[in-house]
Curated annotation (Swiss-Prot):
The lineage of its organism: Bacteria, Bacillati, Cyanobacteriota, Cyanophyceae, Synechococcales. The 24.5 nm encapsulin nanocompartment is formed by 60 subunits; monomers form pentamers which assemble to form shells. There are 12 positively charged pores where the pentamers meet with a minimal pore diameter of 3.7 Angstroms as well 3-fold axis channels and dimer channels. InterPro entries: Encap_f2a, SrpI-like. This is Type 2A encapsulin shell protein SrpI. The record marks 262, 273 as: May bind cargo. The gene is enc.
Amino acid sequence: MTDNAPQLALRDVAARQLANATKTVPQLRTITPRWLVRLLHWTPVEAGIYRVNQVKDASQITVACSERDESELPETFVDYIDNPREYLLSAVNTVVDVHTRISDLYSNPHDQIREQLRLTIEIMKERQESELINSREYGLLNNVAPGQLVHTRNGAPTPDDLDELLIRVWKEPAFFLAHPQAIAAFGRECTRRGVPPATVSLFGSSFITWRGVPLIPSDKVPLENGKTKILLLRVGESRQGVVGLYQPNLPGEQGMGLSVRFMGINRKALASYLVSLYCSLAVLTDDALAVLDNVDVTQYHTYRYN
């Protein structure tokens, strides 16, 4: 149809002015599943302090097996370390400002205040997971015992390397934690050896496993110049593993350790909301965490088929 042809019916451009568009809520590309936060066991703390008491010297605790005679029984006691480590909750805070004119006029079909808070909370939770891994004070990578740090044999993460981690966290290991590129690199090494890893379904998603332990991806594990790390955790307080810490019963509580409080409206008609997220992490015993260092994710292999 040429531009000079007569119009015989209503056209699309004009018709769309009478139609309603179905609108999504704002999409945020940086949102991740945050598997680490889901898989950790979370412990409520009082007054924001968590003290990890430990036995001083287990080798000094003496017991005896009965010899069916009248020999004297040993006498013993369990001593504790004098200065146990205390973990303090860390806070992730921000203030969300929304102009009242915006929230009054443009909150249909999606509430502007709710969406502003939702997206802000998502960003804060992403930061929370990053801190659980990388924090200088309590992050996993900065709290691994020297004897629990393993180096790769040849750079690329091999089944032998992950076996070394399993040797160090052999008591009820829960999951490996690695950058997605590290998991892909491990998959390539398995394919090269002809031992494709099995898979398991968690939370409706599939994960590859090694020796029955799932490899959980997180883009918060550092990746620099093609090198990264792989972690292995045992989790839970009853297992003397790694536990997440949070403050319960917060004013304006919206979730575990999460608080949203209205701060008022200023003379510029800006409504302010204080959003706070309190959390930390504790490694209860040294053998609850091991790290594979110097993991090279840049190695690829060429396969020849006959």
